[in-house]
A protein has these predicted regions:
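Tryptophan-rich substrate-binding surfaces of secreted polymer-degrading and adhesive proteins
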Residues: 1-191, 262-266
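Conserved, function-critical positions that sit in or immediately flank catalytic
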Residues: 140-288
Length: 288
């Protein structure tokens, strides 16, 4: 019987490890006084007896790790013009291996909800938008969701060339807190559970002479969309209302003089995008 280790399982395991620092004592060992062949890229660690023995032999100091010395993290992808980014897809079995979220030069983190090919418009242009989406459909076709900004203190301690720190706020920050924390709390508070931010075109159909009617049916409410037809084929779907509380939905296409179109919804995670960025960004890594 086949089985998989799910992202949720990995995140739960990571959470248990992070929480364990409050009641257990961990130390980080420091060693190897001689340089690596390339100091910016040390050798990959391996889990075998030889490596473990070598680590102990080279160790010359240990640092106690407190609960404030560890944070969830996700791979760092800096937004760069001319790059094609993947959009979030609730049915993509390889989503964790794709660049579906980015960090800007200002340490703002954005998730891609709709890809438009080569990205040319920096999502950072819109700045901090704690509700709704950043719609660049008229420029490069992308739609982004602002997730959070890495606080200055957090970034100076945990931001690396390969990973970004990710945190979930369990309570509202004090009014005088870092603006980044206040903005993140606003994003978490404004998250819409079960919203449909995108509809995928499985087949564009044929013979459409006008835009057909797109209907969203499911266990949620208020999701609406319109279709764009080019050359008799449905080529784009625009969400005019993302709705709420969907866990399942079916998209039907009627009218327009054509046939054969097939569409499917992309439903957001439990709680909505931004409610818990650790879940959205698959943060089953830690930075110490």
């Amino acid at each position: 019987m086949s089985a998989i280790i799910t992202s949720k399982f990995r995140l739960d395991t990571t959470e248990k490890f992070v929480d364990s620092l409050a009641s257990n004592t961990f130390y980080m060992g420091l060693g190897r006084s001689n340089s690596w062949p390339d100091d910016t890229t040390p050798d990959d660690p391996y889990e075998n007896d030889y490596t473990i023995n070598t680590l102990w032999e080279n160790m010359f100091a240990m640092k106690k790790c407190e609960s404030v010395d560890i944070i969830y993290s996700s791979p760092r992808t800096l937004w760069t013009s001319g790059v094609t980014y993947s959009d979030y897809d609730d049915r993509d079995v390889n989503i964790e291996g794709k660049n579906y979220f980015v960090v800007s030069d200002n340490n703002n983190v954005f998730m891609c909800l709709k890809s438009g090919g080569v990205s040319t418009t920096n999502p950072d242009i819109a700045g901090v938008t704690t509700s709704g989406v950043i719609d660049h459909a008229s420029t490069d076709g992308y739609i982004w969701k602002y997730m959070y900004t890495i606080p200055v203190d957090t970034g100076s301690k945990f931001l690396t060339a390969s990973f970004i720190p990710v945190q979930y706020l369990t309570s509202a920050p004090d009014p005088g807190s870092d603006t980044a924390l206040l903005n993140q709390w606003s994003v978490q508070d404004n998250a819409i559970d079960g919203a449909i931010y995108a509809i995928k075109i499985v087949s564009g159909g044929t013979g459409y002479t006008s835009a057909p009617t797109v209907t969203v049916s499911g266990n949620g409410t208020s999701a609406t969309a319109t279709a764009t037809v080019t050359g008799g084929v449905i080529t784009d779907i625009d969400m005019t209302g993302v709705g709420a509380n969907y866990t399942k939905a079916v998209i039907t296409v009627t009218g327009g003089g054509g046939s054969g179109a097939s569409l499917r919804p992309v439903i957001g995670p439990s709680g909505g995008f931004g409610k818990d960025p650790r879940n959205d960004l698959r943060s089953h890594y830690v930075t110490i």
